[in-house]
């Protein structure tokens, strides 16, 4: 689960390295976000000469969380880190590559482009 002030790893090749959640979208009182939810992030660390700069504000989708995800068949899946992929205005991924595994729940959240860019879907 991700809430405001949570630091996340940026898992794409846009140039951002570390981002901070500044808003969870989907209701005025919404506190937590899970895999497949859209959040607003501020880039805290970035690679020099990249399209994404430190201090930029973007929308992002969460692709991994440290908090376990319960599936319908009773299994649980959890990852080592909290990670996101930066999105453009049309909610398409801004980068051309996604690093690391992504959760299968992104397929249910209609982020097929992110799923197809990922090397591994768990």
Swiss-Prot record:
GO CC annotations on file: cytosolic large ribosomal subunit
Gene field: rplN
UniProt-listed PROSITE patterns: RIBOSOMAL_L14
Cytoplasm as UniProt keyword: no
Family indicated by similarity: Belongs to the universal ribosomal protein uL14 family.
Quaternary structure and interacting proteins, as annotated: Part of the 50S ribosomal subunit. Forms a cluster with proteins L3 and L19. In the 70S ribosome, L14 and L19 interact and together make contacts with the 16S rRNA in bridges B5 and B8.
Bilayer-spanning residue ranges: none
Protein's job: Binds to 23S rRNA. Forms part of two intersubunit bridges in the 70S ribosome.
UniProt-listed Gene3D superfamilies: Ribosomal protein L14 (2.40.150.20)
Entry-linked InterPro entries: Ribosomal_uL14 (IPR000218), Ribosomal_uL14_bac-type (IPR005745), Ribosomal_uL14_CS (IPR019972), Ribosomal_uL14_sf (IPR036853)
Keywords: Ribonucleoprotein, Ribosomal protein, RNA-binding, rRNA-binding
Protein name per Swiss-Prot or TrEMBL: Large ribosomal subunit protein uL14
One BP annotation, GO: translation
Lineage top rank: taxon: Bacteria
Molecular function terms from GO: large ribosomal subunit rRNA binding; structural constituent of ribosome
Native organism: Borrelia duttonii (strain Ly)
């Amino acid at each position: 689960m991700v809430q405001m002030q949570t630091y996340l790893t940026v898992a794409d090749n846009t140039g951002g390295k570390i981002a901070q959640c500044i808003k969870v979208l989907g209701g005025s009182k919404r506190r937590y976000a899970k895999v497949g939810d859209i959040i607003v992030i501020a880039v805290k660390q970035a690679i020099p000469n990249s399209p994404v700069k430190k201090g930029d504000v973007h929308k992002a989708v969460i692709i991994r969380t440290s908090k376990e995800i319960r599936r319908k068949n009773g299994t649980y899946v959890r990852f080592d880190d909290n990670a996101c992929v930066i999105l453009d205005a049309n909610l398409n991924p801004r980068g051309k590559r996604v690093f690391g595994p992504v959760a299968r729940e992104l397929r249910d959240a209609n982020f097929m482009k992110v799923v197809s860019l990922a090397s591994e879907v768990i």
